[in-house]
């Protein structure tokens, strides 16, 4: 096998290593951004139960089925449930977090456009799961 060159294999291995390093660095960066909750974020408790959502603001104000927030302000959701497992989802803002009894899961977001956006349960939670919806209302 004299004259056989390994250069194509080494180039292939080098390209794969560079791509894996890039994907790993991007994944680490995204994880770091997701975990960094802004210091001024308002905490909103989100409680799922068959078959509606309850929202409790830091000042004690409660809303059922509708959540009113301000545009360009950060919010941290503390999500739990009173009964079976649910999954809190605001599709337009890529918010998706499980609601598990006895546990508080956190996720944050900062709405950047005003309007009304659907809130849904993304975990089958019983007979009326399809009707477990709410509305996020982002105000100027």
List PLM regions with ranges.
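Extracytoplasmic beta-sandwich strand-turn segments characteristic of Greek-key/jelly-roll folds
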Residues: 1-11, 67, 90-114
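Solvent-exposed coil/turn segments that connect beta secondary-structure elements
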Residues: 49-51, 72-74, 80-84, 93, ...
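Histidine- and aromatic-enriched segments that form or immediately flank copper-ligand environments
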Residues: 54-59, 83-101, 134
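Extracellular/periplasmic metallocenter environments
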Residues: 97-140
């Amino acid at each position: 096998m004299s004259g056989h060159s390994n250069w194509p294999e080494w180039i292939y291995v080098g390209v794969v290593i560079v791509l894996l390093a890039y994907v790993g660095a991007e994944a680490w960066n995204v994880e770091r951004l997701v975990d960094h909750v802004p210091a001024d974020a308002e905490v909103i408790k989100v409680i799922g139960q068959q078959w509606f959502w309850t929202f409790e603001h830091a000042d004690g104000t409660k809303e059922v089925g509708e959540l009113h927030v301000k545009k360009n302000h950060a919010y941290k959701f503390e999500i739990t449930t009173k009964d079976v497992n649910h999954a809190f989802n605001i599709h337009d803002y890529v918010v998706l977090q499980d609601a598990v009894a006895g546990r508080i899961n956190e996720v944050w977001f900062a709405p950047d456009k005003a309007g009304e956006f659907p809130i849904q349960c993304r975990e089958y939670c019983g007979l009326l799961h399809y009707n477990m919806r709410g509305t996020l209302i982002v105000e100027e």
